[in-house]
Amino acid sequence: MEQAPEDQGPQREPYNQWALELLEELKNEAVRHFPRIWLHGLGQHIYETYGDTWAGVEAIIRILQQLLFIHFRIGCRHSRIGIIRQRRARNGASRS
């Protein structure tokens, strides 16, 4: 009967440590793109909803990832990633 191979790959860091490092990176990036008062409000909402739990950590990671993705997708002034909306020239050559 076939058996799954033994895990002989490199040792992975614990999930909790990885999640906290990821959250720290996301927070550092988020403060560069969003007002601190918004981020503080988000943190308060997560804390009131989940308390000091891993579910709260996972929720804020997910929300920050989504916010940053959408922010970059729309077009961040600090980044070359995203859709850059160009304004139409108003030189009298518009449609009538």
Swiss-Prot record:
InterPro entries, per the entry: RetroV_VpR/X
Job of this protein: During virus replication, may deplete host UNG protein, and incude G2-M cell cycle arrest. Acts by targeting specific host proteins for degradation by the 26S proteasome, through association with the cellular CUL4A-DDB1 E3 ligase complex by direct interaction with host VPRPB/DCAF-1. Cell cycle arrest reportedly occurs within hours of infection and is not blocked by antiviral agents, suggesting that it is initiated by the VPR carried into the virion. Additionally, VPR induces apoptosis in a cell cycle dependent manner suggesting that these two effects are mechanistically linked.
Family matches, as Pfam families: VPR
Keyword Cell cycle appears in the UniProt entry: yes
UniProt subunit comment: Homooligomer, may form homodimer. Interacts with p6-gag region of the Pr55 Gag precursor protein through a (Leu-X-X)4 motif near the C-terminus of the P6gag protein. Interacts with host UNG. May interact with host RAD23A/HHR23A. Interacts with host VPRBP/DCAF1, leading to hijack the CUL4A-RBX1-DDB1-DCAF1/VPRBP complex, mediating ubiquitination of host proteins such as TERT and ZGPAT and arrest of the cell cycle in G2 phase.
Gene3D superfamilies xrefs: 6.10.210.10, VpR/VpX protein, C-terminal domain
Coiled coil: none
Stated name of the protein: Protein Vpr
UniProt key word Ion transport: yes
GO cellular component: host cell; host cell nucleus; host extracellular space; virion component
Segments for region (Homooligomerization): 1-42
Post-translational modification summary for this protein: Phosphorylated on several residues by host. These phosphorylations regulate VPR activity for the nuclear import of the HIV-1 pre-integration complex.
GO biological process entries: DNA-templated transcription; monoatomic ion transmembrane transport; protein homooligomerization; regulation of DNA-templated transcription; symbiont entry into host cell; symbiont-mediated activation of host apoptosis; symbiont-mediated arrest of host cell cycle during G2/M transition; viral penetration into host nucleus
Keywords of the record: Activator, AIDS, Apoptosis, Cell cycle, Host G2/M cell cycle arrest by virus, Host nucleus, Host-virus interaction, Ion channel, Ion transport, Modulation of host cell cycle by virus, Phosphoprotein, Transcription, Transcription regulation, Transport, Viral penetration into host nucleus, Virion, Virus entry into host cell
Family: Belongs to the HIV-1 VPR protein family.
Phosphoserine, modified sites: 79, 94, 96
Organism this protein belongs to: Human immunodeficiency virus type 1 group M subtype B (isolate MN) (HIV-1)
Subcellular location: Virion; Host nucleus; Host extracellular space
Additional note from the record: HIV-1 lineages are divided in three main groups, M (for Major), O (for Outlier), and N (for New, or Non-M, Non-O). The vast majority of strains found worldwide belong to the group M. Group O seems to be endemic to and largely confined to Cameroon and neighboring countries in West Central Africa, where these viruses represent a small minority of HIV-1 strains. The group N is represented by a limited number of isolates from Cameroonian persons. The group M is further subdivided in 9 clades or subtypes (A to D, F to H, J and K).
Gene name as annotated: vpr
